UniProtKB/Swiss-Prot annotation:
The keyword Isomerase applies. It comes from the Bacteria. NCBIfam families: PRK11025.1, rluA_subfam. It catalyses: uridine(955/2504/2580) in 23S rRNA = pseudouridine(955/2504/2580) in 23S rRNA. The keyword Lipid biosynthesis does not apply. The active site is at D144. This is Ribosomal large subunit pseudouridine synthase C. Pfam families: PseudoU_synth_2, S4. PROSITE patterns: PSI_RLU, S4. Belongs to the pseudouridine synthase RluA family. Its EC number is 5.4.99.24. CDD domains: PseudoU_synth_RluA_like, S4.
Amino acid sequence: MKTETPSVKIVAITADEAGQRIDNFLRTQLKGVPKSMIYRILRKGEVRVNKKRIKPEYKLEAGDEVRIPPVRVAEREEEAVSPHLQKVAALADVILYEDDHILVLNKPSGTAVHGGSGLSFGVIEGLRALRPEARFLELVHRLDRDTSGVLLVAKKRSALRSLHEQLREKGMQKDYLALVRGQWQSHVKSVQAPLLKNILQSGERIVRVSQEGKPSETRFKVEERYAFATLVRCSPVTGRTHQIRVHTQYAGHPIAFDDRYGDREFDRQLTEAGTGLNRLFLHAAALKFTHPGTGEVMRIEAPMDDGLKRCLQKLRNAR
C-alpha cells in the first residue's frame, strides 16, 4: 500500500454550499476518507471554520472559510488502480448532457451507481475522479447495478434540492424499456401492488408484493411483440426499490435475465434463439424533468447498447 498526504486546504463556502452540516461537507471534500476519520479530525479541532473549532452539526454559512487538514489516504497499488482508471475514462464517453447545474449520462449495465458493499467503483466515484475540479457532484436518483440508461447527477446543491422536490412531487417522468416473458396483454396498462422490502441473512435486498408494503404503481405500454416475448415501456408512478422488476413478475411477465425475480426457462429460450443476451433487459430509456436553473422542461433519451439492439433484431427475425 502507498499513502498520499495532501496539504492543508482552505475552502470558501459559496451560497450554494451554505446550509449543510460541516460533517456532510467534509465527506464531499475528503473522498474515500472513512467517516470515523472525519469525526476524529472534527473532534480534535483540526478542522476550523473562520479559525474556530466547530462541532459536527455546525451548519455552514456563505462566506465561511473552512480549514481542511492534510489527511493520509491509503491508495491501492498502480496495478489494482488501472482497471478503475479505465472505467473512469469510459464514463466520459457516455455523458449525454452537461451544463453548470446537471450532468446526465447513459449508465452502462453492470456498473453500480455507488461504490461500497464490496464494490470499489461506482458511477459517482468515477465522475468525481473524472471531474476533480467539481465542488459538488451528487446522484439525484439511483439505478440498479444491472439496469442501464439515463442517470441524472446534480452539480449544485440548489439543483439537487430542486430535482429531489420534483421526485417527491412526481414532477419527474421516467420511462424504461423491458423485455418480458410471453405476450403482455394490451389492456393491462397499470399494475398497482404494494411492495415490501426485506433484507435476507446474506444482506441481499429482496422485494415482494405484500399488503403490508408501500403503495406502488407502474404504468405499461406494449412497444413490440415477438414469438415468446414482449418489449414493454414501463413508467413508474412511485419509486420503490426493484419496483418494475417485481411488478412485471407479479403480472406474470418477468424480465429477461433477472437473476432475482426472473424465469430461467425464459432465459434459456432467449439463449437458444441466439439473442446473445446475458444481462438484465431493463433500460432507463428517457427522463423528463424541469431544468433546475432555467425552468425549461427537458426530455433526455439514452440509446440502448448494441447488445440489447442485437437481441431485439434477432427476435424480430425469428417472428
